[in-house]
Amino acid sequence: MTEEYFIQGNDACARGAISAGCRFFAGYPITPSTEIAEEMAVLLPGEGGVFVQMEDEIGALGAVIGAVWGGVKGMTATSGPGFSLMQEHVGYAAMTETPLVIVDVQRGSPSTGQPTMASQSDMMQARWGSHGDYEIIALSPSSVQECFDFTVRAFNLAEEYRVPVVVLSDEIVGHMREKITIPDKVEIRKRKSPTSPPGEFIPFKPQGDFVPEMPAFGDGYRVPVTGLTHDERGYPDASNPEGHEKLVKRLCDKILNHRDKIVDVQKGWTDDADITVISYGAPSRSVATAVKMARSEGVRAGYIKINTPWPFPETEIREAAESSRKLLVVEMNLGQMFYEVQRVASGMAEVELLPKIGGEIHRPDEILNKIMGMK
């Protein structure tokens, strides 16, 4: 039965995880994400799941990786400092194609920064935080409803592409309370199970979509799981240049070749926009209001709300750059996704930045003033 709730974003992430089939959570308390762990500790036992509070964030993501290879869906939640500690395991999960979800409720940074204040300072860390060439998927909610919906989608994407997926929330979205609708059932995708008997199974042999089938430990299949460069059997093959290139390119291509299926943006008034405002997460709320105000004053403004920062929506941004005279990037940092927009729009449109740090969200009038100054 579909029901309505008045809850905060962090609770919605937890409920989204449960609805998506998550049955294992390991984490370490850190502001402003702790409510996710608290809610999972309450909800999981009733669903036959397991909650573990680990000694630190390193152990938390390691435990999730182990649980996922044990056959369940797993998640952890953290904030910037903890996300930094997880990066070695993020790379390991990418290399071993371990599907899992990380919720990063961003706060002011660097270092321990502003534990109780909002930020969007982990955007580049989500994409490039671990060493090496790899691709991940990241989603950026701007409302409590999206915290639920995007967490469900994060699990589906993780399972479909066997990749770590990051939900890039922030303190504002995580702690705001709104009415949301939670359906009785949601679309649930599961990793592909082996279609051949154990004696014939090749664990890292890709299917047509570049994604291998995935058994669980204990199912009777032999599956070596190593962070070393490995062949399709899973055996280390670290001295083979051709083998390494083949593996790493496949890890990237399984995301990049499905970019059109993964990327999600929302647009408003972009058909005739002379100035297009680009944002993601919490600032998108102010952007929509500011653009509406600008249009009421005769300015042909529009907006693009990026729901999937990674993989970056290059096609959509390029189209905006081709049709608009100027682009404005609004984000709660000193400029991170701004550089991606600038890269894609180079030679087509002028790109400006409206940054903000210190823990507060942009006000609509601040954005409106910037738009009016760009006319």
Swiss-Prot record:
Q: How does activity depend on temperature?
A: Optimum temperature is 70 degrees Celsius.
Q: Which Pfam families match?
A: PFOR_II, POR_N
**Which UniProt keywords are present, listed alphabetically?**
Oxidoreductase
UniProt note: pH dependence? Optimum pH is 9.0.
**GO terms for biological process?**
organic acid metabolic process; sulfur compound biosynthetic process
Task: Write out the coiled-coil annotation as residue ranges.
Answer: none
> What's the top EC group for this one?
oxidoreductase
EC id: 1.2.7.3
Molecular function (Gene Ontology), one example = 2-oxoglutarate synthase activity
Q: Which SUPFAM superfamilies match?
A: Thiamin diphosphate-binding fold (THDP-binding), TK C-terminal domain-like
Q: Which reaction equation describes what this protein catalyses?
A: 2 oxidized [2Fe-2S]-[ferredoxin] + 2-oxoglutarate + CoA = succinyl-CoA + 2 reduced [2Fe-2S]-[ferredoxin] + CO2 + H(+)
The yes or no answer to whether the keyword Oxidoreductase is present is yes
Q: How does it assemble?
A: Heterotetramer of the KorA, KorB, KorC and KorD subunits.
Identification of the protein by name: 2-oxoglutarate synthase subunit KorA
Instruction: Say which species the protein is native to.
Output: Methanothermobacter marburgensis (strain ATCC BAA-927 / DSM 2133 / JCM 14651 / NBRC 100331 / OCM 82 / Marburg)
